[in-house]
Structures are given as C-alpha cells and as structure tokens.
A protein has these predicted regions:
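Gram-positive cell-envelope targeting signals
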Residues: 1-7
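Short, solvent-exposed recognition patches
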Residues: 9-115, 120-121
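Surface-exposed amphipathic alpha-helical segments
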Residues: 122, 127-148
C-alpha cells in the first residue's frame, strides 16, 4: 500500500508542471534587457519572415523563425556559458566539427541536411536548430556570420 501512495504522490506532483521560463518579447532589445546580453540575428531566413523572440532572465535569448503558414523554419539561441544549448538530444549519423570563418562549430545531421549547429566563443554558447528549413554548409556559414 505504501508504494501505491508514493506513486500517486509522484503523479500529482508531475501534474503541477514546470512554469515556462521564457518571456516572449517584441524586440531583441527587450530580450537583451531580460537576458543581460545582446543578440543580433538576421531579420528573416528564406521564406521564414516572422520571428518570435523570447528570453530567460540572466540566461538565454531565442529567436524562432516562422513562415506564412506558421511552420517553424529554425531557431537561434544564445546563452551565457559554453554548454550545448540546442535542446536537441537526438543521435545523428553525421557529426563533424568544421571551421566557419574564425569559428569552430559542430554540425549534426544526416544525409547532407544539417539539423543542429552549436558553437561557443568562450563566453557565450550559440545554437541553430533547423525545423523545416533545409540547412547546408553554405547556409550555416551565412547565418553564423550574421549572429553576434
């Protein structure tokens, strides 16, 4: 009987849920005030012309790009520290570290499509997660050059 009671308590505890740490804002300037650092990213990416900008206090800024039918193209993240902040824990067939300009990045994907790119500059971590957008090495290089 004691085991049953513990199981019930755990289930009830999980139903409460964790509050979403992200605060949705209108501009990168607002996001930088929340996160405590700046992020600059391209205004659009291909057909993905709508942005949702969100921030976690003293931690992270995330920009999600959507197309006209609200399909997610990709998301770009920047956070304090040097950890992998992609949020993507899938196993990929292709994982390689490449040099893009002066930056060493790790690209993960399969069959020529890059799904995740992560890098850090010693102070901040960055991540690009592809949704429906197709990313190749050239697209990644252009994005990285425009993410600060």
């Amino acid at each position: 009987k004691q085991e049953t009671a513990e199981t019930t308590n755990v289930t009830q505890g999980q139903d409460v849920g964790v509050p979403n740490p992200y605060e949705i804002v209108d501009t990168l300037e607002e996001a930088s005030k929340i996160a405590g650092f700046n992020l600059s990213v391209p205004a659009t990416y291909g057909d993905y012309k709508k942005q949702v900008i969100q921030a976690i206090e003293d931690d992270m800024i995330e920009v999600i790009y959507f197309n006209d039918t609200d399909n997610e193209g990709l998301r770009i993240r920047k956070a304090i520290g040097t950890d992998d902040i992609s949020g993507d824990y899938n196993e990929y067939k292709d994982v390689e570290t490449v040099k893009v300009g002066d930056v060493e990045v790790t690209e993960k994907g399969s069959d020529g499509d890059i799904a995740v790119v992560i890098w850090n500059d010693g102070t901040y971590s960055y991540a690009i997660d592809a949704g429906e957008a197709k990313l190749n090495s050239e697209a990644i290089a252009n994005l990285i050059a425009n993410i600060k």
